[in-house]
């Protein structure tokens, strides 16, 4: 409890300091600094609110107990407040628990069709729609940066940006970070005339997006920039200028493309953001792999080739192999109802973090 009090005191001090910064007109002359301060302020706000509610409930409980000595009618109120205080203490402890430092950040997501031809591309399209529906329900903004469709309207490869509408301690990363890995589907493909169940797969990559590209060191000498004419479905030209951008990071071989914007400058800026996210993730994953040597694999795996989940159409079942989660509501999940699964994954990660801290 003493450590919790100390943590709250530190947060209160930081919060008041942020309030003073936000009241300073000079801050708003620096957009990047204002964004950082506003984001941190939003991250601390839930802790401040719960702490205030807890202090108020504790004061009310003390008063109710005193009055209950003289008037037994206040005993019920005291008992209600005792329950409220315990609930708020648990909520505050949860908010103060160790967190992933990227949880408040936006993300870049890539979905790639795996083995299985058209069927794999159609499944990748199903995953795309599932994530889009979940994002819409939870107030995230989805932006397609680059995509390639299959002949039947599936997704061969797509790159997305998923962002919070407002700064929050529970950003897109806190929700989607567990999705990286191989997703497997079992169903009868639309191209199968004999009604046989087949297995196909799609790969999902997820990276936290840095607040500023400048926060990730990228030497201009290490990149090659190619421009080309953006195209739509089937290669049909949709832009008569060379506005699409392909950036190759020579030391790592990473390639990023963006053709969403009509301006080459805008596409280059977005491609650089995606490259920064991928390089940052690569660096952090290398460090995490070193730190995890000899330790059990984490819930959010660093192995992008690992099969993390199976979607079984005939049995309407979804299975997450990392935590043993199973549910027979595949239709709802594909409609964006991922809350139960994500909550289970978050709980497993939280338990893992607490164990590591202990």
UniProtKB/Swiss-Prot annotation:
GO terms for molecular function: translation release factor activity, codon specific. The keyword Protein biosynthesis applies. Coiled coil: none annotated. The modification N5-methylglutamine is found at residue 236. InterPro entries: PCRF, Pep_chain_release_fac_I, Pep_chain_release_fac_I_sf, Prokaryotic/Mito_RF, RF-1. Methylated by PrmC. Methylation increases the termination efficiency of RF1. Its main location: cytoplasm. GO terms for cellular component: cytoplasm. Pfam families: PCRF, RF-1. The keyword Phosphoprotein does not apply. Disulfide bonds: none annotated. Keywords: Cytoplasm, Methylation, Protein biosynthesis. Peptide chain release factor 1 directs the termination of translation in response to the peptide chain termination codons UAG and UAA. This is Peptide chain release factor 1. It comes from Corynebacterium glutamicum (strain ATCC 13032 / DSM 20300 / JCM 1318 / BCRC 11384 / CCUG 27702 / LMG 3730 / NBRC 12168 / NCIMB 10025 / NRRL B-2784 / 534).
